[in-house]
Amino acid sequence: LVARLIHDSSERRDKPFVTVNIAALPETLMESELFGHVKGAFTGADQSREGRFAEGDGGSLFIDEVGDIPLGIQVKLLRALQFGQIQRVGENATRTLDVRIIAATNRDLRKLMEQGGFRSDLYWRLNVIPIAIPPLRERREDIAALTRWFIEKFSKEYGRPVRGISREALSALMRHPFPGNVRELENAVERAVLMTRREILSTQDIQLERSEERRVGKECRSRW
């Protein structure tokens, strides 16, 4: 959300905003996902493909969980940051791009760097304007606003008629510790919007990580 806000508040707002979650990628496909590949570069590469860097040319690329990038690929990421150049897998030529990088991680990159798991030159290249965001459990005042924003987002995305959440359902969210941080809240709201038959989400619609097999609370007719 912060990355999107940075992009939307900048001169690049009308250009692409591309995201990639490193933690969700197998290491074997990570380089191709970031930088692209040419046809025949590896088994299964039946056609050439642009990577996330090329997709974000002129705009912003948000790299989530950047601390999970292996050392070998960190070298290529550093070159992209330093010189604005990338090289697709299986291609000798380099391409020059204009992409602003916004990176996030839940790991201590300085400690990882000291342990040899993260390049120091890449660390300092990324650490230009650090922004520390407390976990959701430490800023519960944001839960209501985020919940409404996610409801609006997913209602539009999936064409669902959901337009709000009951007070009791919101209270259940406010009490939850959210070990999965904002992503856990987003997933819970997305699932609720998809599965409900109501216009107002109730406690019966909200399922949280520690209680996947039962509903949260009891139905309440009060509305937020």
Model-derived regions: residue spans:
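Conserved post-Walker A coupling segment in P-loop NTPases
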Residues: 1-43, 54-70, 135-140, 188
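AAA+/SF3 P-loop NTPase mechanochemical coupling elements
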Residues: 16-18, 47-58, 62, 70-76, ...
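Catalytic acidic motif of RecA-like/P-loop NTPases
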Residues: 67-68, 78, 207
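Nucleotide-binding/hydrolysis machinery
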Residues: 10-15, 90-100, 108-211
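Short gly/ser/thr-rich secondary-structure transition/capping motifs
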Residues: 40-47, 83-88, 111
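Conserved small/polar residues in nucleotide/adenosyl-binding loops
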Residues: 213-220, 224
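A short, noncatalytic alpha-helical element within ATPase nucleotide-binding/catalytic domains
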Residues: 4, 31, 35, 74, ...
